[in-house]
Design a protein with these regions (language model features):
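Pocket-lining segment of extracytoplasmic ligand-binding domains
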Residues: 184-186, 195-227
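Contiguous mixed-secondary-structure segments that line small-molecule binding/active-site clefts
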Residues: 56, 97-195, 207
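Extracytoplasmic "Venus flytrap"
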Residues: 36-53, 73-78, 223
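Bacterial N-terminal signal peptides
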Residues: 11-22
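Alpha-to-beta junction loops
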Residues: 63-66, 82-96, 193-196, 210-218
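N-terminal export leaders
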Residues: 5-11
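Short, polar/charged alpha-helical segment
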Residues: 44-69, 183-187
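Immediate post-signal peptide segment of exported/extracytoplasmic ligand-binding proteins
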Residues: 23-39, 59-67, 141, 164-176, ...
Length: 227
């Protein structure tokens, strides 16, 4: 699960534009508002395509008012550094992992453990309901950002460099399994019987290729897109 975040100052600016519709057009004869977007997603990943749809929709809704700049592959900011970049005013929008939010808003660690969310419908119910809205509020207050929405990453599936019959935790003994860098995910990796290895998503494919790690448990569409 990932979340789309936007700087609060930008929300205020967008609201001001929306409310000032009655002003003369000359009042807005100014440069476009930059919207720098950072995501670790690769071009073929549907999360990257999501941002393209966002850009096209915004250009259609507010033509000429925003300069949307989509930075893929964590090329603008390394995964996990986006909140600090947003706080400094160097980034407006990002898809950020729940465990990176939990570093600044510990209450959000509720959503960093495995198997908390059953499926897309359950995720939507949780985050559209009182629990999710309260967590959004806490994160916004502590990080000075506005959480726009959650993004369903997919069902996590274990995949290894070498063929191995895995039926019990004992079958993963000695396997260096890449996990997200939160203590909850690392605990899950150990509970599965593997040697949990924290690694940013953007480094996973090369690490698999070189043997730095033996496996990972991302959704298969995400893995295929990153190849």
């Amino acid at each position: 699960m990932k979340l789309s975040l936007i700087r609060r100052s930008l929300v205020a600016a967008s609201a001001a534009l929306a409310l000032a519709g009655g002003l003369p057009a000359t009042a807005f004869a100014q440069a476009k508002i930059p919207l720098r977007i950072s995501t670790p997603a690769v071009p073929d990943d549907w999360h990257a395509k999501m941002w393209t749809v966002f850009k096209e929709s915004l250009d259609k809704s507010a033509p000429g008012e925003f300069d949307v700049q989509i930075h893929l592959n964590a090329t603008l900011f390394k995964q996990g550094t986006e909140p600090a970049a947003m706080a400094r005013g160097n980034l407006e929008l990002a898809t950020i992992s729940a465990f990176d939010i939990a570093k600044l808003a510990p209450e959000f660690s509720l959503f960093t453990a495995g198997y908390v969310i059953r499926d897309p419908q359950h995720q939507q119910q949780v985050f559209d309901g009182p629990i999710g809205q309260e967590m959004f509020k806490l994160a916004s207050e502590k990080m000075d950002v506005t959480v726009l929405s959650t993004i369903y990453l997919g069902t996590r599936q274990l995949n290894l460099r070498e063929v191995r019959n895995v039926r019990t935790p004992a079958d993963l003994k000695g396997v260096k399994l890449r996990m997200p860098g939160s203590k909850e995910w690392l605990f899950l990796g150990e509970a599965l019987g593997a040697t949990a290895t924290p690694l940013a998503f953007g480094e996973v494919y090369l690490a698999l290729k070189t043997g730095t790690i033996d496996g990972q448990d991302n959704p298969l569409p995400t893995v295929r897109a990153a190849k």
